[in-house]
Amino acid sequence: MKIDLNCDLGEGFGAWSMGDDAAMMRIATSVNVACGFHAGDPDIMHKTVAMAKAHGVAIGAHPGFRDLHGFGRRPVPGITAAEIENLVAYQIGALQAVASLAGHKVTHVKAHGALSNVACQDDMTARAIAAAIKAVDPKLIFVVLANSKLVDAGEAAGLAMVHEVFADRAYEDDGNLVSRRKPGAVLHDPAVIAERVLRMAQDGAVVSMTGKVIKMRTDTVCIHGDTAGAVDIARGVRTALEANGITVAPFARS
C-alpha cells in the first residue's frame, strides 16, 4: 500500500511567515503552494518551490479567494463561475511561472480554505475550479475531498484525481469537514491523529465527530502547516504509516 502526505506551505507574506516550512518539507511528499491570493508572494513562492525541488517533493498550486486579511477562509458571496475560473487559472499560472524559474514542475492543484469548502457542497464552484484546471493544463491532477462535489466535477471534466482526507480536521456525518468555528474542529494530539490516519489508510474510512464510520477513498492525507504542533503531527503520522508497512510517497512525479 502507498499513500501520500501533503501539506499547505508557502503561506507567509512579505516579512511575515507561518509554520515551519523547512521541517515540514522533510516529512511531506507533496506540498501545495499558496499563490498570492490568500497568502504567498513571488519571493516566498520561489523559495518554497526551490526547497521542494531540493527535497524531491512534488508541488501543486493552492489557489484561494483573494483575501489576504482573512487568509482565504471567508466565502465570497455572489462570486460567479467565470470569476472563479479566472482566479483559479491566474494562480495556477503564477505558480507554473515561478516553478519554471526554479527548475521544478507543477503536478497538481488543490483549492484552499473557503474556496474548497464551498466547492465541496456547491456544484457551480466545483465545476468552475475543474474547468480552470482543465483549461490551463488537463494533465494536472485535481486533489479533491473524498465523497464531495469536487469528485463529481473532476469526473465531468475528465481530470485525473487524487482523493484526500484530513489528518487534523474533524468530520461531520455527511463527510464534510467540521467548520473551524466549531469546538473540536481542529485536532492537535499527535498520537490520536497518527492512529486516526492509520485507520484511514488501512480501512479506507474516517470516523465523524458523532462516531459514524464513513467510507472514504484515501490517496493522500493532508496535514495543515499552520496547525499548532504540525511538525510533530506530521512526523508521528509518517512514522505510524511506515511502521505498519505503508509506503509514503508522492502521488505524482514531477
From Swiss-Prot:
Q: Which family does it belong to?
A: Belongs to the LamB/PxpA family.
* Keyword Repressor appears in the UniProt entry: no
**Assembly and partners?**
Forms a complex composed of PxpA, PxpB and PxpC.
E.C. numbers: 3.5.2.9
InterPro entries, per the entry: Glyco_hydro/deAcase_b/a-brl, LamB/YcsF/PxpA-like
- Any idea what this protein is called? 5-oxoprolinase subunit A
A molecular function GO annotation: ATP binding
Catalysed reaction equations from the record = 5-oxo-L-proline + ATP + 2 H2O = L-glutamate + ADP + phosphate + H(+)
Q: Which gene encodes it?
A: pxpA
Keywords assigned by UniProt, alphabetized:
ATP-binding, Hydrolase, Nucleotide-binding
The answer to keyword Endoplasmic reticulum applying to this record is no
GO BP, sorted A to Z: carbohydrate metabolic process
| Role | Catalyzes the cleavage of 5-oxoproline to form L-glutamate coupled to the hydrolysis of ATP to ADP and inorganic phosphate.
Which Pfam family, an example, fits this chain?
Answer: LamB_YcsF
